Swiss-Prot record:
Residues engaged in binding S-adenosyl-L-methionine: 1943
Role summary: Histone methyltransferase that catalyzes methyl group transfer from S-adenosyl-L-methionine to the epsilon-amino group of 'Lys-4' of histone H3 (H3K4) via a non-processive mechanism. Part of chromatin remodeling machinery, forms H3K4me1, H3K4me2 and H3K4me3 methylation marks at active chromatin sites where transcription and DNA repair take place. Plays an essential role in regulating the transcriptional programming of multipotent hematopoietic progenitor cells and lymphoid lineage specification during hematopoiesis.
Keyword set includes Cell membrane: no
Ranges annotated as biased composition (Acidic residues): 637-646, 1067-1087, 1104-1142, 1175-1197, 1229-1238
Originating gene: SETD1B
PROSITE patterns the UniProt entry points to: POST_SET (PS50868), RRM (PS50102), SET (PS50280)
Sample GO molecular function, one term: histone H3 methyltransferase activity
Protein name, as recorded: Histone-lysine N-methyltransferase SETD1B
Amino acid sequence: MENSHPPHHHHQQPPPQPGPSGERRNHHWRSYKLMIDPALKKGHHKLYRYDGQHFSLAMSSNRPVEIVEDPRVVGIWTKNKELELSVPKFKIDEFYVGPVPPKQVTFAKLNDNIRENFLRDMCKKYGEVEEVEILYNPKTKKHLGIAKVVFATVRGAKDAVQHLHSTSVMGNIIHVELDTKGETRMRFYELLVTGRYTPQTLPVGELDAVSPIVNETLQLSDALKRLKDGGLSAGCGSGSSSVTPNSGGTPFSQDTAYSSCRLDTPNSYGQGTPLTPRLGTPFSQDSSYSSRQPTPSYLFSQDPAVTFKARRHESKFTDAYNRRHEHHYVHNSPAVTAVAGATAAFRGSSDLPFGAVGGTGGSSGPPFKAQPQDSATFAHTPPPAQATPAPGFKSAFSPYQTPVAHFPPPPEEPTATAAFGARDSGEFRRAPAPPPLPPAEPLAKEKPGTPPGPPPPDTNSMELGGRPTFGWSPEPCDSPGTPTLESSPAGPEKPHDSLDSRIEMLLKEQRTKLLFLREPDSDTELQMEGSPISSSSSQLSPLAPFGTNSQPGFRGPTPPSSRPSSTGLEDISPTPLPDSDEDEELDLGLGPRPPPEPGPPDPAGLLSQTAEVALDLVGDRTPTSEKMDEGQQSSGEDMEISDDEMPSAPITSADCPKPMVVTPGAAAVAAPSVLAPTLPLPPPPGFPPLPPPPPPPPPQPGFPMPPPLPPPPPPPPPAHPAVTVPPPPLPAPPGVPPPPILPPLPPFPPGLFPVMQVDMSHVLGGQWGGMPMSFQMQTQVLSRLMTGQGACPYPPFMAAAAAAASAGLQFVNLPPYRGPFSLSNSGPGRGQHWPPLPKFDPSVPPPGYMPRQEDPHKATVDGVLLVVLKELKAIMKRDLNRKMVEVVAFRAFDEWWDKKERMAKASLTPVKSGEHKDEDRPKPKDRIASCLLESWGKGEGLGYEGLGLGIGLRGAIRLPSFKVKRKEPPDTTSSGDQKRLRPSTSVDEEDEESERERDRDMADTPCELAKRDPKGVGVRRRPARPLELDSGGEEDEKESLSASSSSSASSSSGSSTTSPSSSASDKEEEQESTEEEEEAEEEEEEEVPRSQLSSSSTSSTSDKDDDDDDSDDRDESENDDEDTALSEASEKDEGDSDEEETVSIVTSKAEATSSSESSESSEFESSSESSPSSSEDEEEVVAREEEEEEEEEEMVAEESMASAGPEDFEQDGEEAALAPGAPAVDSLGMEEEVDIETEAVAPEERPSMLDEPPLPVGVEEPADSREPPEEPGLSQEGAMLLSPEPPAKEVEARPPLSPERAPEHDLEVEPEPPMMLPLPLQPPLPPPRPPRPPSPPPEPETTDASHPSVPPEPLAEDHPPHTPGLCGSLAKSQSTETVPATPGGEPPLSGGSSGLSLSSPQVPGSPFSYPAPSPSLSSGGLPRTPGRDFSFTPTFSEPSGPLLLPVCPLPTGRRDERSGPLASPVLLETGLPLPLPLPLPLPLALPAVLRAQARAPTPLPPLLPAPLASCPPPMKRKPGRPRRSPPSMLSLDGPLVRPPAGAALGRELLLLPGQPQTPVFPSTHDPRTVTLDFRNAGIPAPPPPLPPQPPPPPPPPPVEPTKLPFKELDNQWPSEAIPPGPRGRDEVTEEYMELAKSRGPWRRPPKKRHEDLVPPAGSPELSPPQPLFRPRSEFEEMTILYDIWNGGIDEEDIRFLCVTYERLLQQDNGMDWLNDTLWVYHPSTSLSSAKKKKRDDGIREHVTGCARSEGFYTIDKKDKLRYLNSSRASTDEPPADTQGMSIPAQPHASTRAGSERRSEQRRLLSSFTGSCDSDLLKFNQLKFRKKKLKFCKSHIHDWGLFAMEPIAADEMVIEYVGQNIRQVIADMREKRYEDEGIGSSYMFRVDHDTIIDATKCGNFARFINHSCNPNCYAKVITVESQKKIVIYSKQHINVNEEITYDYKFPIEDVKIPCLCGSENCRGTLN
């Protein structure tokens, strides 16, 4: 400051202040100047001047500045530069502490033309992009194809990875993965910069270019993996643990830490925070590391899952501790030591000196690097401090980390005090693990498939320590038991599967099963390695969750919320899983382990175990380790996440058997081979479990699951050969030792639900996959599925699980697994329902659980396990092969049968079943992928059957691939095919299949259509039994094809436990099976006579076989068991078939619960394949016999058809053979049908029926008794039926019976006529199949019979559904195939199945053409699975329509037999209640009855009435034509109640169901004997229609009484007998249910004869039958039911729900849940909005129906788009109808001459007139004669205006019409338009203050485009003082030439590109 001061202006001076601050403070001075500085001027006080005016001291000498100016140079301030002060963000580098959010995505293999902007635009759609960086070679500046994109949100990163990975961008398939810390990218960068790889050869799949084999190494050692991840080669467990996140060594180190975290310690797990935190900073690393650990900080710090995942996302390797540990955490602290111990353990092997960590025991933070040698041991050596991380750890869940299962971690380590806390406390201290394997060695070993036995990290410490590599030790196995479910797939296995393979697996819907099967080969080694199986396994297991999430990113970090269920386990695990996929590929490079991430947090147990082992072994496998960590942490989450894995979670145990499954995470990866050698494997099932590893939960830091919930006991070491380290048994509730033998049950609910949530669409796949399902809906559906499956508590399932495990079955898909978890998980800690379960670390032992000690015999155990697994796999393979062979054989037989049937039905409607089969056959292979789902859907054991998830035990065991046919529902549905519905296919699949088949059959034959009820098919698995042989054969063939082609898939999906080799074996067996099948065919041929003699038995066998085929897929073992038992008794056999079918649908249901369940149990235990194989073999043998019988029947039917025509149809050959006398002998199948029906009718009725068969027509007495009115008619009908001579034609020809009579033919005397409610039920049943033409059924009908599938379908249409039993079972038992309905024979109608079929006659016009919605429908008698049944039971138009349609129940009959009550309830739900014209209570009761019926086999006299009630629905005969009115039958049945015509119809419907129940008739048992009346019934319709009232067709044409076995007669009469009425219907339903139940598997009903197919047009029964729609599958029903989660529920639905609830309460069926349920009113939530009407053509339909009264329709963009593509040069003339078109309605131009004259005149005028006059003239002329213009899509831009007539030069073309507005308004509008998104400007400036706005109103001139070389110009003319803009032609314009003019926009800075494309285009409009 200068001493001189300006003059002071005191007046301006502010009050003096001691200091500048004073005045400034008071006056807020902006500036001040020290005027006097005492230092310069002695003796002066400091003097400040403020703002040039005020002084600090008042001094006279002070003068303020007169002009205050800014002293700074002004120039620099003239321009304002915007300064962006961006909010600083944390830089997440190697020093970042805590879980790294997986927001960073690494792109690899990018096209070198991709630049930042392009990449940013590409990623923007997935979320806000914070940073985009493309890496270039620093020297050459060459594009490396690698890019980093940092998203603002984890979700955005995950979505980007999910949607962009493996997609083609600029011609390159790019690799996208979550690279949390960029380690993967740096690795790639190093690999590229070093020149080792080119951008396109970059080993992204392996994630670590260093060691593409890392996967293998991964399994062996985390350290190795880490090394690899770090870029080190597999062997590099180096000191440079985390030198560089990307460095080969470093990343691994981090990765190692990361992976090691997973492997041996929470620390490692913790990844972000120092690994050591466990000790000193338990929270920092441990908590983070072991999401399971209670310590939140630990969790938070290194939420292994979170951190891991996040890191992993960044860079799988780096993601893990690799980066963190090494870089900061591990080194950081002693805590790191602990963590490091863990981390180092796995990372050490690769990068850090895990030894340090391990050796330190968690005390030395630096040890990671310091003790490279320890890396191998690190895991095993529990870090000293490790033991102590504290419970606190657990609480700290990193948002990203996958929380450990929240169940109290089973105390794996004694140290681990708290479940997780203990673990943490244990500091992940692992009980001293077996000596660490050399990292490299373990890796190598693991790959080899020998358990390398990498030094098992302290199992305890590992498990406790944050899911270190538990894989090694059995103990970890124990803990990871649950994790196994999740983990096993998660870590190691997942790595194996690349994201692509995993996705592929998911797409194939084989998530759990397929993966399992797929991995068979790698099963010896850890599947995880490279094999998709491992991936599969992962998917199946924890991995699956990743698959489910299918987010390569971190599940935990990124999607904490992603996993609904994973509390703490955020999406980390799931994400990592996908990450693992993606990462795994990348991580492979980094280390084999990267995939581990996929392993959802193993419940700490298996995954941890495996992870530990794998990670330990592959110390370097950071991704794995990370995954493992996450997997462990988010083990539960993963489980949940693994929706893919839905079954996966359960699979864990089941998976266990599979190597991949067994090894949760790493175990799966390192799996048996790696684990076995070095790690002590969990003791084999027989061995006492090793000390459980630390509770799996601790390893899962993220698992928020309440600790109290003890994870299920860790799965015992899986017996699967593939699983080196079987998952330890799931930890039992705290204190409860996990069952050593049983594989851990994955928390079923959690896994299932969470998985379902995530993966539901996958699981549901084709069926539901497409449908939008809200989380709630998915949860509900899953829950329902689970419920259906009957989540068994672990213990119950344990036996099965153990068996399955030992058998090599995987519970992967088995709900049971889930079941147990659901119980324990759900119960205690599972805050969430099932989904959360996975969260809790199932593998985590209960809090008190003692961690397993490394088993010194682990290697031995592992070796043994491997051997056992191999053997199991071999067995499974053998079984699968046999099954496949059988499938092939049966398929061949089916083809042959179809061919024969087609030939037989040549005169009738063509049968497409054969074709369908052929079509289907190929499908099996495709289906293999969906096989899982199919099998799941079919798997009765599963609750998914309805869902079609194909996740059930059955699904797993079943070789869905065999049943892949399911995908060809048409096949099943096609009557022609007469295939029984393939149980193996998922319900939905079945539906599809049945629909397809039905469609084909419908095309071929209405009969077939009727038989094959698309819905029925979908709904009932076995209902198509009637086509059993055919179906079986075809199905088997298909199965075999699918099995052989996708044997692995089949194996995987079919039997989780099936070893990888299973596929091969399966194929081999398939060949064997084929041979067997061929032999079987021969046998069948030989047996034909035998079967004829005991057609019931044969029929049963055949049906059973078919059933088995279906059932095999769905529940092979169940079917096998049931079939085996049932095969002995034809009736029983039939019941079995039916039951099997039912079971397939209701496996988890009541019926299935017991016999089915036990079968399933044993099946699962025995190895899904072997037991199914056996069952299938047996079943197939039976099927073959049946088929042979059916063939014979077909032949006979052909003969009889030749002789009797329709009768032959009905008899299907067999009946023909039986002839009049046949009724008694009718074929056991028929008898069986009758039996069922009879049962439904009454016990006595059945006997009477049996006795009655011989009775002549006169024996109609009982019928009379039952229904006196029907007696006469019945007698006639019965006579016809009995009489061999009367053919179906006769029946058809017959005038409609009087109401009495009509019923009579139906009457097959059901004991309880009332039960047989003649309701539209019957019609509804038939409706699915289109009414058959009344034409006499061609002999080919017999063929139909042969093709069970076909008959059911035709039956559906023509034949009334079999009696309940028949429908459900009879179809099978009756063996429609065996007993082809004679075309003319009505008797078959009487026959249980035929009767049923007939009973539900299909009115010619009936919409009910029975496509055989249910198998019962399909075969006419085929029962439908309950869900399906109900589904398929449509409401009938008949008065009885309300009848619940036992039809549904019918199909359920079989189902019921299997599922018992469940089936019944389903029926009720779907079938009975739906139609519900019956009293609701009745339907409710019906379910009980159905249930009972389902349970009870044929002999359920008491229930008979109920089944009958249900039976009516099956009745498919058209009301107009009686199926068969076998008087004898009726008599046998007892007094027939003749309902009014309508009633009769209902009765028929009922009868059908009921008849099958009367097994008394031999025909019932003898399929051959059983002439399917369905056909005839359908045919009988032709006779003069009875009054609409009588449901039965007109007096049955001369039915073949003889042909109509009594059973058939019975079937018939019951429907007639059942009087229409609420009671009748109820009774009928009940009876039907009973019948179905008693009837067991239905015989394939013979294919419907043409007659049957086409009901007589005249039959009054046609009374407008309500359209019969394909019965909905259980899945569809569930979809509809749970659609409330999507669309809400309206008042009506709420009301009905309430009513149903009340009725159920009244019914009191012993449903405990009902008593525990309280109805609470809830407001409707329906948000449905009117659906937009779709217009197929451009012309809009007029709302008012009249164009003149219609207003103007605005044309929406969609409509316009239709024309955009059309060429501009459309016809010169406007379309005749311009209604929906945008062509201006302009008067047609006058003659061309006139036009030309006017144009010439205008030119002349313009030449001599002033411009104004000329313009005015032109304008006026234009007004009078508009030019013909049109707007079309323009090549210039969007729409354009085109001339429709030649326009001369200088002619006025059009006026630019719009609103005249002022500039101000124009400006406002322009802004508003922009806001509204109106991009184009239609404002035309007239002058400086006037603008014409044509935006909202105007004419076509607004469409004129700009051109730089226009053919028109705009001119402003004044008309009546108004300025107008007119477009004039500049030159001659031709027709279809576009009108253009120069917009002449003012020149502006912002240029608008010109698109005119003219030669002299300026390029811009302005």
